[in-house]
Amino acid sequence: MKQSHFFAHLSRMKLINRWPLMRNVRTENVSEHSLQVAMVAHALAAIKNRKFGGQLNAERIALLAMYHDASEVLTGDLPTPVKYFNSQIAQEYKAIEKIAQQKLVDMAPDELRDIFAPLIDENAWSEEEQAIVKQADALCAYLKCLEELSAGNNEFGLAKTRLEKTLELRRSQEMDYFMAVFVPSFHLSLDEISQDSPL
């Protein structure tokens, strides 16, 4: 049986730190971020289905979100100000991401490749799936800003403002619901979020 480096590469997601140009109270890695994006994307899909007449496969969307930054094990996490410095850099980075996604897919064993390819290759996602994962990705970055600001780290003030604009551009009914129901708790301390439901 031929060996595959697929999961050895994926396990390195935990070694790639996000927000590398900014001082962090708590460092966040790509593995942690991917789990949170998967949970939030699943919630957004479930909210859309339950409250707003959606027909999404919430479990598939959670899987897509789990793998949405997987190619960064080959490219690293390029800081947002660099990635979107101008349209040419953004376009070139998208091309690099596509190459990295394909390289990662090619590492999977032949008999499993058709399972992992549609999870890693964003071109295999529907527009609606892409939109939900992008919403969740932006929401999680926004939540990171709230956590850092709550811890007294003003370094994330401008990032929060930028992400508020991004969230407004990606706005949806399910995102509005999530923002109204779940986000306010991120401004509270552990004691405050625990007092209503003590063990």
Curated annotation (Swiss-Prot):
UniProt keyword list: Cytoplasm, Hydrolase, Metal-binding, Nucleotide-binding
InterPro entries given in the database record: HD/PDEase_dom (IPR003607), HD_domain (IPR006674), YfbR (IPR022971), YfbR/HDDC2 (IPR039356)
UniProt keyword Hydrolase, yes or no: yes
Chain residues that bind substrate: 18-19, 33, 69, 77-80, 137
Main location: cytoplasm
EC number(s) per entry: 3.1.3.89
EC top class named in words: hydrolase
Signal peptide, first to last residue: none
SMART domains: HDc (SM00471)
Function: Catalyzes the strictly specific dephosphorylation of 2'-deoxyribonucleoside 5'-monophosphates.
Protein name, entry field: 5'-deoxynucleotidase YfbR
Originating organism: Salmonella typhimurium (strain LT2 / SGSC1412 / ATCC 700720)
